[in-house]
Regions:
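Short, acidic (Asp/Glu-rich) active-site segment that either coordinates a divalent metal cofactor
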Residues: 51, 151-194
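Glycine-rich phosphate/pyrophosphate-binding loop regions near the starts of catalytic domains
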Residues: 11-165
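Glycine-/charge-enriched secondary-structure boundary and capping motifs
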Residues: 1-24, 45, 65, 99-124, ...
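Short glycine-/acidic-enriched loop or helix-start segments at secondary-structure transitions
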Residues: 60, 137, 174-175, 268-270
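Short, acidic Gly/Pro/Ser/Thr-rich loop/turn segments
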Residues: 45-46, 55-57, 147, 170-173, ...
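A short, polar/proline- and glycine-enriched secondary-structure boundary/capping micro-motif
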Residues: 58-61, 175-176, 300-305
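Short pre-catalytic strand/loop immediately N-terminal to key active-site residues, enriched for Gly-Thr
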Residues: 65-69, 179-185, 202-203, 245-247
């Protein structure tokens, strides 16, 4: 079994580069192989940038999922932040930290999952770095663009707004609880871009740490409270029915969009037609200290510390 230490840094970089199409896209002026990537941005656009760290033992466990699945989830988690801003993706940077004795096949499958998932969503891998470390980890930086001043933001909510969420929640948490992760969500990139044109759109955030936790972040940024109806929260299908309510409320890694709309804006049916996705109204924003009301005691969400 060949290990990373058997091939060295530059050979490993070359092997990862082979996972990327030689012509990554018209917006990529310079891709992998130079000191930095060069990406084209249209006139009248703002650059959107986000970074996520994905660390073995904290964010993924290779005894519960394949390296490729872990890599796919890392890419989706980073791209989902672009979706929450309503941005179109431009490129992805990957900083990979690898223990020297890691099997080469493990690292390449992990990178293959990242590069493949990014390409699937129109986001070429355009550069990065490889370093030695004690634990396998990936730090991804996603770059996107949005019309100047038109990015969706989590601080645009107002008391009286109605709250909506796309898709269904809880499947990723359900699989983690069972010790076998196979499901990989999808970043709602197209839906985020379409949301920017919705009349009365308020705040927006992606559901990465759990519905309740992320709604709490939206409330803090917008300086409002929220009240949700747990019975209306859409729960993902599971064997024998639906995932438990607590996992839909606090599970995390759903990568759906949670957003608010002014009272005079469209309802769930019109939003479904606009976004091309299931959309459910789950509550509203209210005046008051930043907190989520209406939930049973217990559900919180993922925390790094």
């Amino acid at each position: 079994m060949r290990r990373v230490s058997d091939v060295g840094e530059f050979d490993l970089i070359e092997r990862i580069a082979r996972l990327v199409p030689r012509r990554p896209g018209p917006g990529v002026r310079v891709g992998i192989g130079d000191d930095a990537a060069v990406l084209g941005v249209r006139r009248g656009e703002d650059l959107v940038a986000t970074t996520d760290a994905f660390v073995a033992g904290d964010h993924f466990r290779l005894d519960q999922e394949t390296p490729r699945t872990a890599g796919r989830r890392a890419a989706v988690g980073c791209l989902s932040d672009l979706a929450a801003m309503g941005a179109r993706p431009l490129g992805l940077l990957l900083a990979l930290a690898v223990p020297a004795r890691t099997p080469l096949a493990t690292v390449l499958d992990f990178a293959r999952g990242i590069a493949g998932e990014a390409a699937r969503h129109g986001t070429p891998l355009v550069g990065g770095n490889v370093a030695r470390a004690r634990e396998l980890s990936a730090t991804l930086t996603a770059l996107g663009a949005v019309a100047r001043g038109r990015a969706l933001r989590r601080d645009r909510g107002r008391a009286g707004d109605r709250l909506f969420v796309t898709g269904a929640l809880g499947r990723s948490a359900f699989e983690r609880a069972r010790g076998s992760v196979r499901h990989v969500g999808a970043p709602r990139l197209r839906a985020g871009q379409r949301l920017r044109g919705v009349r009365g759109i308020g705040a927006c955030i992606d559901v990465s740490d759990g519905l309740v936790a992320d709604l709490g972040q939206l409330c803090r940024a917008s300086r409002v409270a929220a009240r949700i109806e747990p019975a209306r929260v859409p729960r993902a299908a599971a064997r024998g029915g639906r995932v438990p309510e607590r996992l839909a409320l606090a599970g995390g890694e759903d990568y759906e969009l949670l957003f608010s709309v002014r009272p005079a804006g469209p309802g769930a049916a019109a939003l479904r037609r606009r976004l091309g996705l299931p959309v459910t109204e789950i509550g509203r924003l209210e005046a008051g200290p930043a907190r989520v009301r209406g939930i049973p005691a217990g559900p919180g969400g993922f925390r790094h510390f």
